[in-house]
C-alpha cells in the first residue's frame, strides 16, 4: 500500500504552535490505542497509512505505564516520542482548501430505570430482528445505502424509521434501557451516539452506540434552515434547542424528517475523566480524541489540528495534537474531523459552537515517507 499524494510532507517547524502544545495529553490517548491493537489491529484507511507501520511506535508506547511513570510522559518526552516516530504531512480538503472541524460530546441527563409520569421517552437496545446488511446478503431492490435491515420470513426489508418507532412499532419488545424526560434530549443523545445517565436510583450509568435503523441522517439544523426558521450561519446545537423549546408542537414534525434511529447498549463508567469507548475501541480523551473518516484514515493516526479561529476550548487558538479514535456518518473527506469536547453540559456548550476551518497535519510513521530525515 502506497501513501496517497494527498499527503504533503512538512517539518515539525512548519506546524504553528507545535512546540507550545501539551504532547503528554496526546500521548496518553495514543497509549490507550497501543494496548488495544494487541487484541485487534486497526483496519487500513484507503489513503495508504498502513497500520503495520505503527508497530515501533506502539511497541515503545507500551513500555511506558502509569505504574512506573506518573504522568505517563512529561511534555518534553512526549514531544520527542512523536517527533522520533512520525513525519507531519499536510492534507487538504477535496476542494484543495482548508479542512473543517466540528465538535461532539457525551451528554449527561437525568434518567429513570422505569417509565413514570415524568420520564416517558425511552432509549432502546438493539432489536433481535435488526441485522447487518452488505453485498453478500442484500436482496434486490433494497437501498444499497442501507447497512442494516429487518429480518422477516420473506427476507430482509428496510427497518422501521424514527417516526414509526416513536409511534410504537417496537413498543412491545421490551427494549427500553432507560427513560428520559425530554424528547429533544433523547434526540441529541442519538446524534452524539453516547450519554451518561444520572439515574433516579442514584447510579451513574452510560449508554453507547449499538446499531441504527440504517436510513440516511438528516440534521434538524439543515431542515430548519431550509424552512427559513434559522439562518444557516446561525445553526448550532444551542440555536436548534432554543427553537424546539419555543415550538414544542413541531418537535415531531422536524425530528421525524431524520429517519435514522439509534439503538444503544449499556456500558460502565470506569473513569469519570474519560468519555465512552468509541469506534477505535478505546475510551475517548476530552480535547485529544478526534473522529475522522475511517474509510480514508487509519485509527490511531495522530493529527495536528491548526484551527486559529476556534477558541471555544480554552480561549486560545486551537492548535493541538489529536489521536484518531472515532468516526461518524457526517465525517467524510480527508480533511474533516470531529473534536471530542468531553462529557456533560460544559462540554456540550463547547461542542455545540465548533464549526471552524482548520489545517490538518497527519503524522504518518516515518517508514511510510521516503527521505524521512526531517
Predicted regions and their residues:
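C-terminal soluble interaction/assembly domains
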Residues: 5-8, 19, 25, 271-374
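Secretory/export targeting leaders with adjacent low-complexity proregions
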Residues: 5-268
